[in-house]
Amino acid sequence: MIGWLKGEKIDHWNNGNRAGFVLSCNGVGYEIQLSRRNLIALNNYNVLSIWIHQVLKEDGSNLFGFIEKSERDLFRKLITVSGVGPQLAMSLLDDNSYEQLIANVQNKEVTKLTRSSGVGKRTAERLILELQNKLSDFDLNNEFSPPTKLRPESAEDLNEELLTEIKSALRNLDYSDFEILEAVNTVTSNYLDDAASANERKLLLKSLNFEKLFKQALITLNK
């Protein structure tokens, strides 16, 4: 089983809401699926080391990649839950940071968990029931090695309802979640270029409305 790879990123791939890259290691190209958060964080990196979870199938295998071993461990814990497969686990890691996901399970945040694609109320309740007391060993101070993040500030700084509305509107135009989040990241980064302080950045993010963010995200997507 493959557990870790180090090599050069040579290509990207995107198939609906699934995306990743091809990593060249000793003359072999490995196609690896990653969460959008990790893909955006690794955007400016070419030589990478990635923790791998391999899923064997009759017609081959799928490789799921993670920047940190602790996130891979969390992924493996998620797929032990009844009804939660690798793609649903990736969806949860797409829409929640490592720390947020652990906190949402431990704090019984059913509504927040159901914001992830494919996660209904019953699935969220099963996650809480089966994992609530099994995540105490996970490090809540975990930080990814790359300095870049999905958004310039914490997730709470950009209104979650606004982000949900933007995602819904752009999905209706056939953009993938990966493309949408990448565009939002670009727009917010540009919007904050002239901010002088952390407080000013937070205020600027909170001042973004649907019309402004949607228009700029659409411009970015059509470049």
Curated annotation (Swiss-Prot):
Residues 1-67 are annotated as: Domain I. Residues 147-157 are annotated as: Flexible linker. One of its GO terms (cellular component) is cytoplasm. It is found in: Cytoplasm. The keyword S-adenosyl-L-methionine does not apply. Residues 68-146 are annotated as: Domain II. GO terms for molecular function: ATP binding; four-way junction DNA binding; four-way junction helicase activity. Its main location: cytoplasm. Keywords: Cytoplasm, DNA damage, DNA recombination, DNA repair, DNA-binding. GO terms for biological process: DNA recombination; DNA repair. InterPro entries: DNA_helicase_Holl-junc_RuvA_I, NA-bd_OB-fold, RuvA, RuvA_2-like. It holds the Pfam family RuvA_N. Residues 158-223 are annotated as: Domain III. Belongs to the RuvA family. The RuvA-RuvB-RuvC complex processes Holliday junction (HJ) DNA during genetic recombination and DNA repair, while the RuvA-RuvB complex plays an important role in the rescue of blocked DNA replication forks via replication fork reversal (RFR). RuvA specifically binds to HJ cruciform DNA, conferring on it an open structure. The RuvB hexamer acts as an ATP-dependent pump, pulling dsDNA into and through the RuvAB complex. HJ branch migration allows RuvC to scan DNA until it finds its consensus sequence, where it cleaves and resolves the cruciform DNA. Has three domains with a flexible linker between the domains II and III and assumes an 'L' shape. Domain III is highly mobile and contacts RuvB. Homotetramer. Forms an RuvA(8)-RuvB(12)-Holliday junction (HJ) complex. HJ DNA is sandwiched between 2 RuvA tetramers; dsDNA enters through RuvA and exits via RuvB. An RuvB hexamer assembles on each DNA strand where it exits the tetramer. Each RuvB hexamer is contacted by two RuvA subunits (via domain III) on 2 adjacent RuvB subunits; this complex drives branch migration. In the full resolvosome a probable DNA-RuvA(4)-RuvB(12)-RuvC(2) complex forms which resolves the HJ. This is Holliday junction branch migration complex subunit RuvA.
